[in-house]
């Protein structure tokens, strides 16, 4: 099997004799790829090869890039997120970006949301705090319990509880983060029309590597991390990896802190080149996580009669607020190739998630009881989730005349049991923003609901990647059945909701020898909607469709990649308030998101890394039961996002091993509510990074590295987003970290 693309190695697959000869004539890189093609394929074209020029043999490293393995540098060549097969990014007819481990290390990211700051189409800074990593993709997102989180890990969905329980993965355990923008239900089932974030776990390596790192920073940040990996047997059939960290830090708001302990052991058994079984496990405990409460626009975004509310102001109850998360996962990834045609994969994961939540928050509908005095409420919830996700795949690579087919058939299943015991909203004592009194007595509200929710989802899908000459066509369809049973244990009631949806995608890419690849696609998605109308009829799924067109570029050496895309997404059956029965909803809403995305990732020369991105978004409400919001922009979605990251490896004598990096992020203006009564101003932020590999100049210090990172260098005070006049979030202030590590 070889990696194939016009003029360069790019994907495993068959070559027709004529196509192979054309690639050989393109140069040595193509010759190296073609040399690895199964002999039976080339045997068909021996006669045609007589006139081919003889080139100097080139050694080829058998460790080609895959969609789940390490990436050399900041530009990935292959991804599984867009097709569930190892496919070059230039052959995927949809917006797709990959955040590599090298980029995460350069920027010292502390959350998956942090890793997306330099990615087009993504806005992950809508609120601070490590409870829920709310991510907006192509204008679609949410807040609080409705937040859209990075929801895929190793191609499998992560669990979501009834309300506040959500899985969060620490980026230190990840090899890469793939962002597929636009509807992805054809492969992954129910999903936001904005796209998915698929996180890929670190896996055992064939070569031994060991890392210990210590980090400190402002706000009393302290962290210890480790990463050990390597073979367990001399023949390399067994390999292990254990990575993790322990961290504590004060959060930006008073009385808030973040604590985390995570460990992720994994084990790989590879008896031969055709079979691989990897056991993936992890345990994460967030004993105290900052629940960053919202504040009113008056006093933060706009001057208030009581003055400015400081960024460190805590609107909650110090003796009550808490978010304690325990998360344990065990699963495996199995892959076996029977022959050059047939391959099977099976991915399975079980997740147990416990969340204890206590929180006091500002009543965003009526934030003040008097000038400068906040109106608050409090609630609590105890949630437990047991979740199983399974994905079976059969892949076949066949030739039909001059046409190559990569056919993927799959069956996925997801089952969860989520329970929640929770209060209603109780009254919390008012809080004066000028002289806050956190010692006021309060009453914890009693138990108000006990819910057990059991969702089951079964999906079958079929995809064909068709390669004919310079064309690559991707066709796929999926049928999914979803059933959710909700039991009200307090009142003895039960509700059952069953849904069925078909989604599909069609796309085409044309591959030029120059490396340019224009593409176009159409795709659909769906999301189940729980609940009923006033008359008791269950809601139907929310559905969306997208049209997208763009151009990608990949240089022959795979060190430079660029893309531009234009898209138009329409989401229908969105819940809106029933005008005849205000305490119920109807499905009369429609949201449209149009935009343009640009991205460039390049290694210029031998020492300079460049990551650039730009996003233009026009996300508006096209239909709603409330005429006041029709035609208005969706809250918290910036119209413009732009970023530039540079990292340079110094070559001066005496400073070799020094890397200097820096980035600029522009977050454009957004609206503060869905009726566009006020705006959230734009802001420009600057980040810096320094690292020094001490062993480059001094052999005695081999393996030692020191680094420093600064986010929001000029300590800008800004609002990251608002969802109403009573709900706004301050953006993160200046963050400084320094670390020292030893690798051997």
Tell where the protein language model's regions lie, with residue ranges:
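Outer-membrane beta-barrel translocator/receptor signature
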Residues: 160, 172-175, 186-265, 271-275, ...
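Acidic/polar loop-and-plug regions of large Gram-negative outer-membrane beta-barrel proteins
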Residues: 247-251, 263-270, 274-337, 355-385, ...
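Surface-exposed extracellular loop regions of Gram-negative outer-membrane beta-barrel proteins
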Residues: 287-300, 417-420, 483, 508-553, ...
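Membrane-embedded beta-barrel scaffold of Gram-negative outer-membrane proteins
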Residues: 333-337, 343-349, 353-361, 518, ...
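Conserved C-terminal beta-signal and adjacent last beta-strands/turns
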Residues: 407, 520, 547, 635-744
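Gram-negative outer-membrane beta-barrel transporters
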Residues: 470, 568, 587-673, 717, ...
């Amino acid at each position: 099997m070889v990696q194939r693309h016009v003029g360069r190695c790019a994907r495993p697959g068959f070559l027709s004799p004529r196509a192979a000869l054309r690639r050989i004539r393109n140069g040595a890189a193509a010759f190296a790829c073609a040399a690895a093609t199964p002999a039976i394929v080339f045997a068909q074209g021996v006669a045609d090869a007589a006139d081919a020029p003889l080139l100097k043999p080139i050694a080829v490293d058998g460790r080609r890039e895959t969609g789940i393995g390490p990436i050399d540098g900041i530009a990935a060549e292959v991804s599984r997120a867009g097709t569930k097969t190892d496919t070059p990014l230039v052959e995927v007819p949809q917006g797709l970006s990959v955040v590599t481990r090298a980029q995460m290390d350069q920027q010292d990211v502390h959350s998956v949301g942090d890793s997306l700051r330099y990615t087009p189409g993504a806005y992950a800074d809508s609120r601070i705090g490590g409870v829920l990593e709310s991510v907006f993709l192509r204008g679609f997102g949410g807040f609080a319990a409705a937040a859209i989180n990075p929801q895929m890990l190793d191609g499998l969905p992560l669990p979501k509880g009834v309300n506040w329980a959500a899985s969060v993965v620490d980026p230190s355990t990840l090899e890469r983060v793939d962002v597929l923008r636009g509807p992805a239900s054809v492969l992954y089932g129910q999903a936001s029309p904005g796209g998915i974030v698929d996180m890929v776990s670190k896996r055992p390596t064939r070569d031994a590597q060991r890392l210990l790192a210590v980090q400190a920073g402002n706000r009393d940040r302290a962290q210890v991390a480790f990463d050990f990996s390597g073979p367990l047997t001399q023949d390399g059939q067994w390999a292990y990896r254990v990575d993790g960290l322990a961290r504590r830090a004060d959060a930006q708001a008073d009385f808030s802190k973040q604590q985390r302990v995570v460990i992720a052991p994994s084990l790989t058994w590879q008896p031969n080149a055709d079979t691989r079984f990897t056991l993936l496990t992890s345990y994460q405990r967030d004993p105290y996580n900052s629940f960053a409460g919202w504040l009113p626009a008056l006093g933060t975004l706009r001057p208030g009669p009581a003055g400015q509310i400081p960024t460190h102001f805590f609107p909650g109850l110090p003796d009550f607020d808490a978010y304690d998360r325990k998360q344990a996962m065990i699963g495996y990834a199995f892959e076996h190739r029977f022959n050059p045609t047939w391959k099977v994969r099976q991915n399975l994961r079980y997740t147990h998630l416990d969340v204890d939540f206590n929180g006091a928050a500002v009543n965003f509908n009526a934030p003040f009881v008097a000038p400068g005095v906040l109106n608050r409420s409090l609630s609590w919830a105890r949630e437990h989730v047991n979740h199983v996700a399974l994905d079976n795949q059969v892949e076949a690579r066949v030739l039909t005349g001059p046409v190559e087919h990569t056919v993927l058939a799959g069956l996925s299943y997801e089952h969860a049991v989520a329970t929640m015991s929770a209060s209603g909203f109780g009254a919390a004592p008012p809080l004066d923003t000028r002289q806050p009194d956190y010692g006021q007595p309060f009453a914890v509200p009693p138990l108000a609901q006990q819910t057990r929710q059991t969702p089951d989802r079964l999906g079958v899908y079929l995809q064909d990647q068709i390669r004919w000459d310079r064309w690559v066509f991707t066709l796929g369809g999926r049928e999914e059945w979803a059933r959710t049973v909700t039991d009200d244990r307090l009142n003895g009631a039960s509700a059952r909701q069953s849904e069925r949806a078909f989604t599909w995608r069609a796309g085409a890419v044309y591959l030029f020898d120059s490396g340019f690849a224009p593409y176009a696609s159409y795709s659909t998605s769906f999301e189940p909607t729980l609940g009923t109308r006033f008359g008791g009829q269950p809601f139907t799924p929310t559905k969306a469709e997208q049209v997208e067109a763009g151009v990608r570029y990949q240089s022959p050496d795979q060190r430079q990649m660029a893309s531009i895309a234009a898209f138009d997404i329409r989401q229908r059956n969105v819940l809106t308030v029933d005008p005849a029965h205000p305490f119920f909803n109807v499905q009369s809403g429609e949201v449209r998101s149009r935009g343009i995305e640009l991205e460039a990732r390049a290694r210029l020369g031998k020492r300079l890394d460049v990551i650039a991105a730009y996003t233009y978004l026009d996300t508006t409400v096209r239909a709603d039961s409330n005429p006041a919001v029709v035609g208005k922009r969706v809250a918290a979605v910036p119209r413009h996002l732009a970023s530039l990251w540079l990292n340079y490896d110094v070559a001066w004598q005496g400073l070799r091993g020094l890397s200097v990096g820096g980035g600029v992020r522009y977050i454009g203006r957004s609206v503060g509510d869905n009726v566009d009564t006020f705006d959230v101003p734009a802001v420009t932020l600057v980040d810096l990074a320094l690292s020094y590999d001490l062993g480059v100049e001094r052999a005695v210090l081999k393996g030692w590295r020191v680094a420093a990172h600064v986010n929001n260098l000029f300590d800008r005070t800004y609002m990251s987003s608002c969802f109403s006049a009573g709900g706004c979030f301050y953006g993160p202030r200046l963050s400084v970290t320094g670390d020292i590590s030893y690798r051997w």
